[in-house]
Amino acid sequence: MRSNLPLNALRAFEASARHLSFTRAALELCVTQAAVSQQVRILEDRLNRVLFKRLPRGLEMTDEAQALFAVLTDAFGQIDTIFRQFEGGEYREVLTVAAVGTFAVGWLLPRIEQFRQAHPFVELRLRTNNNVVNLAAEGLDFAIRFGNGLWPATHNEMLFEAPLTVLCTPETAQRLRRPADLLQENLLRSYRVDEWDNWFAAAGVTAERINGAVFDSSRLMVETVIHTGGAALVPAVMFARELAAGQLVRPFDIEIQMGYWLTHLKSKPMTPAMEIFRDWIVKMA
């Protein structure tokens, strides 16, 4: 029989570790900051270990705390999954997938109904993000990411290639005779700061510092280009409609190889719902 586990203390610790703040943990748990701090002290006394360094601007986990947090994140995630599977009085497999917004809008959402019709017992919960995810902390089964597939601690399977290329309006393209002419235009950037540098290097152009606005969405960049001009370095495959309509053109053929990837934690066993979704999306891609 298990010894008495300090469940309230573990819950307070997990929330504090996730937020790195007793105050934000207290707001989440609907208790006082003092109550959270006391529960963490109880856990520290129980383990005979210091779990947090109390700093002026927040908390910092010790090595012991990081090890405990990893275990609790997984355990609480599994408990939450089981509860969600029985919501509504019937059993359903819950599958939580995060996707970059451009992929979600441009590829996944138009196909979601096909998945639901084929697999009605799988409740797909879709989140969007800007490609920065923490699968364990966010309780994700899969994340669909854009890049080169070199992410640690995850199994990464390419869905399809989506090379980065320059898109602009036909009016802007008339001013572009060679790649270096782009340096006279407003170059919109993603948070991946080296993309334009890599593109110009592939074009044989030495670029000065690029200071265009930074976006966390390729789709938002493209909408900005259409309405205000400039040029964006984006996966053209996701903007076939705008290209076909003549709203956008590709002034140059130079590309940076990238792709969309289905990723999941190597440490997370595949559930039946995960296997179903993986087989479906790979086939559809």
UniProtKB/Swiss-Prot annotation:
Transmembrane segments: none
DNA-binding region: 22-41
Database matches in InterPro entries: LysR_subst-bd, Tscrpt_reg_HTH_LysR, WH-like_DNA-bd_sf, WH_DNA-bd_sf
Keyword Oxidoreductase set for record: no
Superkingdom assignment: Bacteria
Cleaved signal peptide residues: none
Entry-linked Gene3D superfamilies: Periplasmic binding protein-like II, Winged helix-like DNA-binding domain superfamily/Winged helix DNA-binding domain
One GO CC term, this protein: cytoplasm
GO molecular function: DNA-binding transcription factor activity; sequence-specific DNA binding
Family annotation (PROSITE patterns): HTH_LYSR (PS50931)
Annotated ranges, domain HTH lysR-type: 5-62
Disulfide bonds: none
Keywords: Activator, Cytoplasm, DNA-binding, Transcription, Transcription regulation
Main location class: cytoplasm
UniProt function note: This protein is a positive regulator of gene expression of beta-lactamase (AmpC).
Family: Belongs to the LysR transcriptional regulatory family.
Protein name: HTH-type transcriptional activator AmpR
